[in-house]
Amino acid sequence: MKTKIVTTFLLILLLGIAVKGQEKVTSPEFLKYTNSKWVDSVMKSLTPKERIGQLMFVAAYSNKGIEHEKEILETIQKWNIGGLVFFQGDPVTQVKQMNSYQKQAKTPLLGAIDAEWGLGMRLDSTISYPYQMALGAIQNNNLIYKIGTEVARQIKNTGLHLNFAPVADVNNNPDNPVINYRSFGEDKYKVAQKSIAYMQGMQNAGLLTTAKHFPGHGDTNTDSHYKLPQINHSLERLNNLELYPFKELINAGLNGVMVAHLNIPALDASEKPSTLSKAIVTDLLQNKLGFSGLIITDAMRMKGVTNNNKPGIVDKEAVQAGNDVLELTQNVAKAITEIENAVKNNSILQADIDNRVRKILAAKQWAGLHNYKPTPNKNLVHNLNNANAKLLKRQLVEASLTVLKNDDDVVPLQKLDTLNIMSISIGDSLTTKFQETLGLYDNVKHFNIGNDINPATIDKLKKAINNHNLILLGIHDSSAFPKNKISFSNTLLKFIEGLPFNKTVVTYFKNPYSIAKIKNIENAKSLILTYQDSKTTQDIAAQLIFGGASANGKLPVSIGSKFKAGAGLTTAKKIRFKYTLPEDAGLNSKTLNSGIDSLIQQAISNKAIPGAQVLIAKNGKVVLHKAYGTHTYSDTTKVKLSNVYDIASVTKISSALPALMHLQDANKFSTEKTIDDYLPYFKGSNKAGIPFREILTHQAGFSPWIPYWQNTLRKNGSYKWHTIKRDSSARFPIKITSNMWLNRNYKKKVFKAIKKSPVSDVKKYKYSGLVFYLLPTIVEEITSTNFVDYINANFYDKLGATTLTYNPEQKFSHSKIIPTENDFLFRHSTIHGTVHDEGAAMMGGISANAGLFSNANDLAKLMQMYLDMGTYGNEEFISKNTLKQYTSVQFPDNNNHRGIGFDKPYLIYKGENSNTAKDASKESFGHTGFTGTMVWMDPKENVLFVFLSNRVTPTRENRILYKLNTRTKIQQVIYDAIK
């Protein structure tokens, strides 16, 4: 008795602080319906026993089959329970079940779910958003509000009305076995702010909420699912810390509070769990803190409350303590009987039961159950996973990324040409999404280790480490709670701890507390936290490293003595491609994807192309990156994003042209100079004296092309002995095919043919590729450097464009290279691994007319550099003025629509005969390629389009792609999606 008096006195002292805040308390909005006509009518229809039934919420599963459904229906019909709490299953079945249950219920059921991080916590085929600890790192609480509104939308669309969230516990115990990553962190103010944002987002979207686990479960070493935890903190500490977020939430209009199963002597000296404590539920929560909303017990089947309490009796005591809803009672019949008996003997007043039932019914009316309609399930999964819902997840992940170290601002990576990068993913023996995304930016050598490592692997890795100057280490620890032993073997742990951290960027994909268990990790060149391991976190973390994303998250908890809460560095803004969803750049996913997919499938089904790659970017954000179809019509191998295509004449703007612009910036080249200024061989020819500005805009009067290859053949079709041999030799070193080797001096014949070719006196637009055979030599003459070495060093290596290359079979296997034509005239074989253009082939595969191979992604990097007026990856390649000059129409008065090297839209749009989509701006520029390729950039909309195909397989005579206008129609879809 004395103990009880002392406890009450202490609570009064606590009230001294709490009562002052009561003026700020905002009553839950649903309480306005407590005495509504609908609530009155329902109350009149209920017997005393049925009213008690309204306090009961029963567990329901949509994956347990028909017997479970029958059991739930029987419980609903027999006891008129107040609600259901849904757990594992799938959304469509859940909706069907809930509709069925509602149909059988006398009183509409309140549907609840424990979906702290979204429906994915319970249901398959739905989105799991970041854990609250990850959200705790986010600096913009508007995003927390947004997740609240989105989670509310999804939950309501599955027929439910109440979410047991947010978790308002302040997690200040790294070994907490049950809350931990479910908390917003250890700072009570931030926990309160984020809890309120999450709560308001849900409530403003029409969903009931429940803050938990009152009065605070953040500092326990015991999981209340298995045992009753005890919290021995003082009343002052509890009031100042654990209770703070709950008080703020109550003041902000919180709907509901979930009471935890805790033993807290400072609040109740008895050994009762807090759920059964009147001192905590009634005196503290209701009377002292002024909370008038729904009070819900934590699950009444948890051992923290059942170990020392019998079914039925424990439920009665929970009601006596002041709870409104008994969540997951063990035995509904016993619970109702015990409560009914307590009412009869006046240990529970009927008026108290009625008040609680009115409160529950008021919540139901607020949720719309007074006008119940079945929940539709048509297109439900698609609706739950719509583009905006997916984008929000990505936004939350990016905003949560926390960089704890970043020596020398190593992240984002700069100067890719100076880096030799390897990645090691630990905890996953297969290539991870993290590694796949790293590979989008540069050539990264990947290694994977499971949870253990053997000596042979250690030796192999040590050799690789010595040969690389940067290690990207991804740690995928499967242990969710740091109290558990880290999932790696001691041998592997020692290997990690012995890594040369001074050249290692570490990304930790799990609970941040666990970092404390890895020695020396604080010495990493850079240390990045993602808080959990998923494909999305892996993807965006990799983008962060290369500058496709940025970080400004702050650590929400302290990690031992290594890093304190609030730590976190801000990295530079985006400097390279961001791979994301269309909505992130203001495009409509459905319009974009369905429109392009359908056009590509039309092209494939009409045999215009066997397959393709398409990449679309807006504002430097890659919003579509897809591979379609097969390598050829006869080869069913699927096209991958890593496959490389012969880009044909797109080479014209991808090799020598950027080199010339670069040299112009260095005052080593000018478009006003002539061929003979750089190649004296052409002095005195009909090509002398013609400025490059005219030549590169195709109005110099040059012949369109020269069939150089025909000079290698006799009249009977055999090769002239001095031109081509079946085997290579010192005299015949130039590979055409595996059994065709060209004379080393044939390049001179090509130059001679160009020199002697006619030049028209009429200076009008006439497409010619002749000069592009000369440009590599001109670059070499100016720079005294091998042409390929020059463009690699000054462009491709810096861009990370690792597949943008000449002679791809020198770097890649044939399985990675897409074939082109089955050539019956010259090469008498399928062209695979060498350039399709005969002239380029006779130049050793190296020409500015054709010859380059690439995948869409690497080619897009060069094109994005153009679109960004000469910069990419925080480096300037070409000056803005030079790029503007080259991408502008030079001779419009001469009816010439071309830029310098670049193609431009026709001066007058010609409908289906135009070279671009109708909505492409006059500022746009690009090029097409004979093999079925196209790149196009539009500065007005900041849009980039890359299309790669091999329409020339099996023959160049296949012109269906042109007839279908597939490329320009796809381009128009982009503009339609922007609209």
What are these model-derived regions, one by one?
Residues 353-358, 362-370, 374, 447-453, ...:
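Short, gly/Ser/Thr-rich active-site loops of penicillin-recognizing serine hydrolases
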Residues 53-60, 82-86, 109-115, 163-166, ...:
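Hydrophobic faces of well-ordered beta-strands that scaffold small-molecule active sites
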Residues 21-58, 62-74, 287, 309-588:
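Preference for extracellular/luminal or secreted protein segments
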